[in-house]
């Protein structure tokens, strides 16, 4: 898992200033994870981006009073939708990794059953990847990054 980027806060900051810095940092962290997130061979990318989306969501929720209500509500909803799509893709990734390990531990006579489960998990992974691709396209179409940057501007 990617370690959280430090947020440069200090005791002299107002709550609103802390909100700006925190949301900007967490937003940057989220989009830094986007590279190769659709690669089904590198499942840690999805995990890292999902964790980053949770951190951003938490920051948006904690600092809600600092932002214009409508813009905040829309952005929080979109971050949640992205997190849901990341989860839809991540869950089968975890299943596949577990099933691969289980297959290695079982006798060959049990492999066909595990192979069937692996095939189903791969189908779910593919469907999750499609949902994630669509969510990422929506992020670009609706300029989520730019709107988060605008929200975080002091």
Please place each PLM-identified region on the residue numbering:
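Function-determining surface determinants
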Residues: 1-154
């Amino acid at each position: 898992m990617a370690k959280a980027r430090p947020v440069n806060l200090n005791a002299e900051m107002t709550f609103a200033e802390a909100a700006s810095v925190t949301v900007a940092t967490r937003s940057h962290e989220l989009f830094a994870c986007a590279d190769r997130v659709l690669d089904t061979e590198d499942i840690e990318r999805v995990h890292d981006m999902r964790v980053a989306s949770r951190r951003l969501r938490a920051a948006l929720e904690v600092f809600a009073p600092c932002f214009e209500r409508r813009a905040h509500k829309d952005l929080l909803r979109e971050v949640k939708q992205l997190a849901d799509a990341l989860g839809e893709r991540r869950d089968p990734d975890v299943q596949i990794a577990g099933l691969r390990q289980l297959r290695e531990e079982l006798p060959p006579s049990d492999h066909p059953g595990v192979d069937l489960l692996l095939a189903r998990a791969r189908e779910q992974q593919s469907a999750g990847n499609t949902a994630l691709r669509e969510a990422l396209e929506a992020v670009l179409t609706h300029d989520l990054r730019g709107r988060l940057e605008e929200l975080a501007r002091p």
